[in-house]
């Protein structure tokens, strides 16, 4: 959707929350919901919800609200979930293994094809049928397989080297769990997940209320 190019990052970051909540409504057989009801459940104002959704089209009907199934479907398309994605995880430590064990990824269309590590005790093992390969084979694996997203779960001093290999092999999406900001070309999208940042935000908010 070309229109997405002009959508603010703030709106984009709210979309997964809409998607997740609508999924829960579907599981509970809820057919429709108003922006006011969404507001009460999701924590955004009704006006904000309407503005966000209007960025992508006219999904609601006055006096009726939103068809939950249709809205969930449309947001899925906006998020790119109408296509499957092949993923690899680089780093088979605690974070990498936790991600490999997260079954919801496959339900969303994210298929973890392989993991990579340097630890000889891990190489050759499988997590949910996902084989852990020697990181020395990362480049050759990428040359032979169609991979969309690379997830980096290695220590910070190795993260940029891994990112360089991914970029060299035309990976356009990187989910980075290493505590370092990566340097990549403009056409490569990086989503950083610095776990300590979230925790420090929490401690700041705790102290703000005291």
UniProtKB/Swiss-Prot annotation:
It comes from the Bacteria. GO terms for cellular component: cytoplasm. Residues 17-56 bind DNA. It is found in: Cytoplasm. Gene3D superfamilies: NAD(P)-binding Rossmann-like Domain, Winged helix-like DNA-binding domain superfamily/Winged helix DNA-binding domain. NAD(+) binds at residues 91-96. It holds the Pfam family Put_DNA-bind_N. Keywords: Cytoplasm, DNA-binding, NAD, Repressor, Transcription, Transcription regulation. GO terms for molecular function: DNA binding; DNA-binding transcription factor activity. Signal peptide: none annotated. GO terms for biological process: negative regulation of DNA-templated transcription; response to redox state. SUPFAM superfamilies: NAD(P)-binding Rossmann-fold domains, Winged helix' DNA-binding domain. Belongs to the transcriptional regulatory Rex family. Homodimer. Modulates transcription in response to changes in cellular NADH/NAD(+) redox state. This is Redox-sensing transcriptional repressor Rex. The lineage of its organism: Bacteria, Bacillati, Bacillota, Clostridia, Eubacteriales.
